[in-house]
Design a protein with these regions (language model features):
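N-terminal membrane insertion elements
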Residues: 2-61, 65, 69-72
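Metal-dependent catalytic cores of enzymes that make or break cyclic nucleotides
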Residues: 38-39, 43-44, 50, 63, ...
């Protein structure tokens, strides 16, 4: 709410002038600014109401800017840590981020939502960093017990991400990226619109990269195989609109590389 004061004479505003002068260093400039905005006889309260409203907006902007720098630094740090522990996962996350961004653009989603999806994709598997490395990087098929452990990574990632002040629902998006429309996904078994749109986009991008790319236990199966999976199960596992946008955006693509789409600066 705007700052308001009750006195009706100029001298009654000296405490405010003193405060502003102490902060900005020139009472004459403040006085001239007030006159230029409201005239020689303008009510001083108008000036203070305006000034403190501006102050409030500047504070909000500064807070938003700090939050932006915080999440950018966090994402970069996570990427570096993941790369040092598991280069495959780090590369996978970058490719998924490119692909998810391309799908979201193809869908015509708002720019801010696209950026939120990209950021979530960059850290969507970070929960694996809290799991035993020998399981995450195992060069063979996983046992049922190991699979159950791996399935904890969305929840682990969400718990970590909740500690960061993201301007998007990043923790929830990461938590839900293995959910499926028919409720067969994990960890919550969500169905349909219970799954965030951001997570539905991320899910398709994740599956396409996982199938087409090399895994620790098998070679890559190629982009055509991945797209057949998406096409076959659209409307069942995967959101139909997201799946169609993916198929359109990758039409004619033979390989999926980390520079398929350009990262925003």
């Amino acid at each position: 709410m705007p700052y308001t004061v009750s006195p009706q004479t100029e001298t009654d505003y000296w405490p405010e002038y003193f405060w502003l002068t102490k902060k900005y260093g020139d009472s004459e400039k403040l006085h001239e600014l007030r006159k230029s905005l409201w005239g020689q006889k303008g009510n001083p309260s108008d000036f203070f109401a305006w000034f403190f409203t501006v102050e409030s907006h500047l504070a909000e902007f500064d807070s938003s800017r700090r939050a932006t720098e915080t999440y950018k630094t966090f994402v970069k740090t996570v990427s570096l840590l993941t790369e040092s522990q598991d280069p495959y996962t780090a590369k996978h996350q970058k490719k998924v981020a490119k692909l998810a961004q391309g799908i979201a653009k193809e869908m015509g989603l708002p720019a801010d939502m696209i950026e939120g999806i990209r950021v979530a994709a960059m850290v969507h598997d970070m929960g694996k960093m809290s799991l035993p490395t020998e399981i995450v990087t195992k060069p063979g098929a996983l046992t049922p017990l190991e699979i159950s452990i791996i399935k904890e990574h969305p929840r682990r990632g969400c718990e970590i991400l909740k500690e960061v002040d993201f301007p998007w629902p990043t923790p929830e998006t990461v938590l839900q990226h293995h959910e499926r429309l028919d409720g067969s996904g994990y960890p919550q078994g969500l169905k349909g619109d219970e799954i965030r749109l951001e997570a539905r986009v991320l899910a398709v991008a994740d599956v396409v990269e996982a199938i087409s790319g090399r895994r620790a236990y098998r070679p890559g199966l190629g982009i055509e195989t991945a797209l057949k999976e998406i096409d076959k199960h659209k409307g069942v596992f995967y959101d139909t609109d997201v799946a169609r946008a993916c198929l359109r955006s990758l039409k004619g693509t033979k390989t999926l590389t980390a520079d398929q789409w350009e990262f925003p600066k």
